[in-house]
């Protein structure tokens, strides 16, 4: 984005397109008030107090035609999200009216905002750092209240503060090394000995490794668990999916092979988003369409974080059952013995002891599945600790891992007896990597790519 483009006054519809009670068209930039005033009949928006809502009408300045009756919010820089003048036009919801107002604003001199450009301006103007900007997107995409809690904490600056404090400590250490090298005669500056540098780098490494330990939980809460429901045809997989969803989304019949594809749905299990994948029954078949579904099922099984293997308690184990037991061995697997409301014929002695007996028909023990998921992935601990900072973003996790590797290189060098001044490079690299997380040292291409993932109007 060019410098000129960054200072344009931008506009976009900030509410989802479609019918609704309210639509919002947003403006941000130096000329936001003047452009809004040029299509507004009511109070002079350039003279009203900041953070006020003003009643009036949007008109076409060429024809004088009234477009809509509106409420206009005026917010003056720097006390706005973008730290620029911001105007929000609250219209009646609807595709036609919001689009008409948007086109009027563009004709009056505003530029159509790019995806995420309002948040990008907040970042460029110092209102938020990169982790906080990403948290805005996480709040929008949060599927559960727990995921939203983590995102809100990140928006509040908890991760930024931890990273910035660590970077400052590393910078202090680097400065001390520099002074010792350049001004060895200064007695009032503590000497950065090998032992002291090892102590400091181990402290930094321990802090970052502790943060990495939160990544598994944070990533699950942010992105969800990819969960494959597997089993031979007609054991109750689709019925289980519907039971967990509490609505009929999959085809449920008594005919084997009716689920010919992979069906995906999200469900909230005690704050954990599960991406449920109801797979076609895995069996040998001559039906080409069903064969494709079976292959997709095997792929879903390989990629799943969690496997729910459904067996039929009212029938003896089949070769297909045994094949699935072997295929899913070693994965995070929960074996579900369905149809326990019927006479049981399955050979329990051939199955692992930690299975869960359920009846999808009567809802028996369905709650135990939720408890087992909590046990498998969270060791029965609370999902979100109130004061903890969580890593949940893959970009952050990758950069923290690289920072730890750089610190390990410093410690390896110290163990080999390398001089302190030669280890500055790796310590400086650690400082730079952490800066990429907050955006202090992030390349322009990365920033552009990140904000392009946002929706229009945000």
UniProtKB/Swiss-Prot annotation:
Binding annotation for (6S)-5-formyl-5,6,7,8-tetrahydrofolate: 26, 88, 127, 458
Top enzyme class: hydrolase
Co-factor binding comment: Binds 1 potassium ion per subunit.
Chief location category: cytoplasm
Keywords (A to Z) from UniProt: Cytoplasm, GTP-binding, Hydrolase, Magnesium, Metal-binding, Nucleotide-binding, Potassium, tRNA processing
Species the sequence originates in: Streptococcus pyogenes serotype M28 (strain MGAS6180)
InterPro entries: G_TrmE, GTP-bd, GTP-bd_TrmE_N, GTPase_MnmE, MnmE_dom2, MnmE_helical, P-loop_NTPase, Small_GTP-bd
Name of protein: tRNA modification GTPase MnmE
Known cofactor(s): K(+)
Residue positions binding GTP: 234-239, 253-259, 278-281
